[in-house]
Amino acid sequence: VLTKERKTKNNTSAIEPVFILDQTFCPNIRFMGKGETLSAVKAISYVSGSKFPSGGLCTAGYCVANEKAAELMKDIETHLKLCNNEATTLQVQLLAKQLPSMNQRISEAYINTRRFVNYIKKVLPEAKINFVSEELAKEGYTPSVFSLDLPTKGGSDKEKENYKRELNLQLINLMIQEIPNESKFCVSYGQLKGCYWTIPATSTQGTTKEEDKDYIVRASLSPNMDMERHEDIFMAFVNSI
């Protein structure tokens, strides 16, 4: 579909489109190298540096183009300079320090997340979990964030929703209270240590209409955290409901 030639209404060749890919959640995947998925079309990939690239130490990100779109990088550079939106020297230094370990951190964070997801499935099978399938993970898509829809009860939809929201906060508050040096109420992802929790399960809370928000828990795990402690506290939560 992406490589299909586009025509204008006069049946002349249209301007070739540019495919823009947000790789914030999978910066370790090579989509645009020779022979890869997006090598045959003009494509630009960008990553939020505040996530895995820097481990949360800075907000500067980066973008790259494949060979077909390489000419566009000069325009992107001009735009960043005009808007005074280039990375600072300190941000570049932080990215240079953290990027060499990024792929390893992604792999280890995924291992922790898969372990926690499997544990939740074991001790609270009624919960609904949205996490990458093991089939996709084998292809290299190894995120370390999942959403958790806790089981609820009540005589009406409103009662069920209110009860679930109470459980959400009960779980998160318990995690923060019992593991204050690791668990945080935070919407970010790709951190160097600890576990981040947030509700609703979206990083675009400010741009989502209230009626479209899904009040379920989102958890983001890191490569450096006490997994046994988190499992113990989750078990305590299960025993309390």
Name every feature range the model reports, one short phrase each:
Residues V1-E5, A70-M73, I111-R115, K158-I179, ...:
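Well-ordered, non-membrane alpha-helical segments in soluble/globular domains
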Residues V1-I15, K193-I241:
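PLP-dependent enzyme catalytic core of the Aspartate aminotransferase-like
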Residues V1-K121, S240:
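Conserved PLP-enzyme active-site core in the AAT-like
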Residues V18, A43-I44, V145, I216-R218:
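Structural preference for beta-strand elements that scaffold enzyme active sites
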Residues I20-T24, D149, S220:
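A cross-family glycoside hydrolase active-site/sugar-binding cleft signature
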Residues L94-I106, R114-I216:
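Conserved small-domain helix->loop->beta segment predominantly found in fold-type I
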